């Protein structure tokens, strides 16, 4: 389970409630779940006690950067009662050690594309580390909204031939299609993807980069938060340009 926010760690909206509750419900059904989020500054350290367990190299436009992977050492009561859920966080303070999750004083961080490209590649680096250590190998990577959508794109492109990800399927849940992760064309290179993907059949969207569009195109399965919303986003009123 990969989410940009999750209760009880960090929250700006309803996405966090879903991403926090769903792993627990899946665990009740007998699934072994790992939740991976960014290590934000707002996470209550005394309460959750995230501690370093390893480092992973994350490719970036400026060369590889080592991200710290932390695991929660004092799980919440709900997780303790359910079991079979572990929470991990990708830590890189220049990106995630800020006052807000996505913005400050009503203004989006201008490097959000770079921040969440880093997060997505950090997630995949962690999964590869799990596999190489024979610790854990997921069957499904469940992604939430535009901030995690690049995981699906990377797995079908840059990471398509890596044995660690053989058989891994992706599910992308759309919580609010109004937020698509759109950025100027000049930032596309920060994704590390080939220029051939910046086309109308790829991540290009009216001259801009659209991360949610990429996730929709490359994920193995799409879900929404309700049957009603799944129908609404197929209309111009709620599809925000992606209804076609």
Which residues fall in each region the model found?
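Catalytic cores of nucleotide-sugar-dependent glycosyltransferases that transfer UDP/GDP/TDP-activated
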Residues: 1-244
